[in-house]
Amino acid sequence: HERTLPFEIPHEICYGKFGRYLGGIMGEVATGGYDLGIVVDPDVDRLAFIQEDGKMYGEEYTLVSVADYILDHVKGATVSNLSSTRALRDVTERHGCQYFASAVGEVNVTTKMKEVGAVIGGEGNGGVIYPESHYGRDALVGIALFLSSLAQKGVTCSELRKTFPTYYIAKNRIDLTPDTDMDAILGKVKERFGSMDDVQVTDIDGVKLDFPTKWVHLRKSNTEPIMRVYSEAATMEEADALGKELMDVVYEMTK
């Protein structure tokens, strides 16, 4: 069954607003007896799946699933950017391998992959980078590897999803004035949380605070006076609360 999907899909895949664009294919998969649905963006470098029950598989779990399949066959490092799900780290360590984080952006991910000799990497927006093919996000490669995993394990899409830890990512933004010194604010956030025993601070791209069971990542925009706040936890409510907590911290620092 052919599907014509609007070019705005990559942005919707990134930010989770699926209903407006993907409702049609989700309903078709759920009622049409399909094993899965496949969604790509116009330049075919981002990839998301629809489960056989019509639910979103989760674009963050595209890379996680493919990495799990690769690590079943070849042991090695994995890489994703700082704003991607912690599930990749969990799966990588489950295979006895090492996970590395890079700054956001495909070039930063591939640079880190080459540096550590990663066997698989990518971004949580559904971007899969498989060095055996080439150093670039490629949805077709991701599709082939994902289907191979389903076939090898003999499971449905929803059954495969249940084998991975579940996290939820909340995405917020802080609107600031053009004269706000965002670098100074990020420095204050790093200083404030850096002395805490249960927080790991990473500052290669904004400031990311890793807590034992959750994280929050603050990044400034290079084109407008806003700061993006991504946070992840075991529930969406907890993830959003963590993001809002850091937003309050930043707003307080601007007074």
Predicted regions and their residues:
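Short, ordered loop/turn segments at secondary-structure junctions
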Residues: H1, P42, G54, Y61-T62, ...
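N-terminal small/polar loop signature for handling phosphorylated ligands or for N-terminal nucleophile
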Residues: H1-I50
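Short, charged, surface-exposed secondary-structure boundary motifs
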Residues: T4-E12, D68-I70, V109-M113
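Generic hydrophobic alpha-helical segments
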Residues: Y21-V29, A67, V109, V189
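Phosphate-binding and adjacent anionic-ligand microenvironments
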Residues: L36, V74-K255
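Short acidic-glycine loop/turn motifs at beta-strand connectors
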Residues: D41-P42, Q51-D53, F211-T213, N222
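Short Gly/Thr/Asp-enriched flexible loops that form oxyanion-binding sites at enzyme active sites
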Residues: D45-V64, L88-R89
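Short, acidic/small-residue loops that bind anionic groups at enzyme active sites
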Residues: M56-H73, A77, A103-V104
